[in-house]
């Protein structure tokens, strides 16, 4: 059976037992990402800024009304959290295939590869949050007590991402074209999340508007904006629902991963 009575999730025990391997992998992911580049880790700041500039140029009139007078801050507070999701899910989906060599030679809990992807993505996200703070101060938003919710929202997003990539990475070992499908869905997913547009644009959009408002990433992105821009507490009921959903996806993802990992060596 898929779910055996008495079967336990050992993911947290694995994190503790293999913490040194996890630290090594996270450091390798972060350093390897910009290895050989002249600017090194500074690209963690430059990449989001370049993305913001592109969208600022491409959508100068269409979206300028979003977020009030400061669309630039509105854009940054949505784009950086979305980039965390996009890059980590993309890398996580191919993580098992990318590490086929070590998987065939060395035993260790394979989920460590996915956890390290999420942690390295989280570190890069936190570095990029410096950009958000800089722009918030530059445009007069400052900082408020609501910033205490930043680690909570980031943790919920990280758990959600981990659950998703546990499923996708294990399926990707068996389904050759899955990573390309995921890439397409992620591209479409940005437009199903209010990253570059205001939710008010969906007023009167009917079912589509309701679906986008119920999107867990919509709630997460708007929670970041509540923290950085609006200085109000995120909607705890909705955020709690996303946290519960993230935990459910994590449990399902772990079960799927452990079920399918037995065939990784043969499929890779």
What positions do the PLM features span?
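Hydrophobic transmembrane alpha-helices and immediately adjacent juxtamembrane helices
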Residues: 1-268
């Amino acid at each position: 059976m898929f779910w055996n009575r008495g079967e336990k999730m050992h993911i947290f025990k694995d994190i503790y037992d293999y913490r040194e391997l996890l630290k090594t992998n996270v450091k390798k992911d972060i350093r390897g990402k910009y290895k050989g580049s002249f600017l090194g880790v500074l690209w963690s700041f430059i990449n989001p800024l370049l993305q913001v500039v592109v969208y600022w140029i491409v959508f100068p009139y269409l979206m300028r009304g979003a977020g009030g007078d400061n669309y630039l801050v509105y854009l940054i507070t949505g784009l950086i959290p979305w980039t965390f999701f996009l890059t980590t899910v993309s890398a996580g989906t191919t993580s098992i295939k990318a590490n086929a060599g070590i998987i065939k030679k060395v035993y260790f809990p394979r989920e460590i590869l996915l956890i390290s992807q999420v942690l390295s993505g989280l570190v890069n996200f936190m570095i990029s949050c410096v950009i958000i703070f800089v722009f918030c101060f530059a445009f007069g938003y400052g900082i408020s007590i609501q910033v205490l919710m930043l680690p909570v929202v980031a943790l919920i997003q990280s758990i959600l991402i981990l659950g998703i990539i546990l499923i996708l990475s294990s399926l990707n070992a068996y389904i050759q074209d899955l990573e390309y499908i995921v890439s397409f869905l992620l591209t479409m997913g940005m437009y199903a999340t209010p990253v570059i547009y205001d939710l008010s644009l969906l007023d009167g959009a009917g079912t589509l508007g309701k679906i986008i408002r119920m999107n867990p990433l919509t709630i997460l992105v708007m929670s970041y904006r509540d923290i950085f821009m609006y200085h109000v507490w995120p909607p705890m009921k909705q955020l709690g629902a996303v946290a519960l959903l993230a935990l459910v996806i994590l449990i399902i993802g772990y079960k799927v991963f452990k079920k399918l990992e037995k065939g990784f060596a043969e499929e890779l």
